[in-house]
Amino acid sequence: MSALQENGQELPYAGGILKLRIPFVHYRIEYQDFIQGAILSCVPLGITAAMVKVLGIPIEVAVLMVVINNFLYLLHTSFGDPSVSGWITAGIPLYISYLTGFAPGPERIKALIALQVLVGGIFLVLGVTGITRWVIRHFPISMRSGILLGAGFASLMRVFNPAQPFMGKMPIAFIIASLGSFFILFSAKALRFRAQSSLFAWVAGFGIAPGFVIGYICGLLTGEIAPPTGVFDRFIIATPLGDMVSSFTALGIGMPSASQWVAAISLAIVAYVLAFGDILVLEAMIDDCNKSRPDENVVFEVPRNHVITAFRNIFQGICVPFLPLCGPQWTGGQALVVNRFKHSTPEQEPSYWGGATSIFWGMSLAMIFHPFVQIVLPAKLIGFGLTLLIQGYLCIYLAFAMCKTNVQRGIAGVMGAALVSANYVKLWDSAFWSGPTMALIAGAVLFFLLEYDGSKEEETVQ
């Protein structure tokens, strides 16, 4: 497989400008990432409860929407974008607040359609014009680091908050799963054991899967996790495609009114501001990949990521309205793929693209099989919590490594704190003044006040 590419070059592709890469032709399926994805299949199903409550969608339709959304993630890695994509997660409380201002039923669905299509339009315009690429190219290191720190702190605060279920409801199972996963993924001893033992290297290749399984078993033994039920109620999930199209899409209920389009504009802008941080995190992780594995050049192009994200939002907005919207990256999944690729040899994992694609093949296919989902569903909090921990760890160490001066570190720290402390808070009765907006403003003011020197060209990440 590694013969397909020269040392340090981009993996070959078909399709010209589209950079189409096909499984078993351009890369192999990495069964370790496939299994990690299958285990995490229960995590995206967690949004179905909110979809049922807020949108009035039957649970079978909500599950079908999640499955369709998951398969569309494959558009990124199939067409040359290294993103392990996901939702625009940070804005979910804002979307729910916005939607509850409309009458339940078709009007509320139309409000979501307007919001999601407008978000897609913003991604499309900024991607095609290259505006975002220019902004990122000139984005100060201190502010990049601040966004990474904020993302890391936000993840870890959720895990260690006693009000959250991770430590509150299953402390023994979650702590054991976390310690096992962190040892395998990040320990210096584990890296040495990988080189000394082929068996340990094989087990470590599964990433969080060993820790998840051990934590699951401990949870069953301690009673912190309930045994799975309804495993064999059916084999394949229900697929009420006709009901979904006729009752919950623009194809069945029509397009939003003019007033609904106007009402969604400000929140659509907020959603893009939230997603902008994910783009910076993605770029930092891919850069980390290229430094750790110089045998392959993984290319991240902001316009490509934007255009694919735009297509997902516009298509889903019309045909599969999706409450969390479609974002450019899922940081937790990205961290798992990046970490395994970094610590694998070219023989163990020949190409980044095999792992980045396999995690979603595993997740998407597993969600179709009802028995498998019912087996892993009781431990979904362990899987979700592990991704948050790993996301927080990687974001924080990348943020620290990025800064070169104490001024940059100070700006990054203030910006990260602003992002976390103001998150989900609407100041001046406006959703725009949420945590990410305040963090960007605070970071920009401090950069120009403390760091910027107009007499010389500022250092930026190219």
Give the positions of each predicted feature.
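Helix-loop-helix hairpins and the membrane-proximal interhelical loops
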Residues: 1-59, 196-200, 204-300, 459-462
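Residue-level recognition of pore/gate-forming positions within transmembrane alpha-helices
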Residues: 66-70, 89-90, 444
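Membrane-interfacial loop-to-transmembrane alpha-helix junctions, especially the N-terminal start
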Residues: 60-62, 301, 407-412
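Helix-loop-helix junctions within the multi-pass membrane cores of secondary transporters/permeases
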Residues: 14-29, 36-47, 81-151, 295-392
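Loop-to-helix transition at the N-terminal end of transmembrane alpha-helices
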Residues: 55-78
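Alpha-helical transmembrane segments of multipass membrane proteins
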Residues: 49-50, 71-75, 98, 124, ...
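Membrane-embedded alpha-helical modules
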Residues: 109-225, 354-462
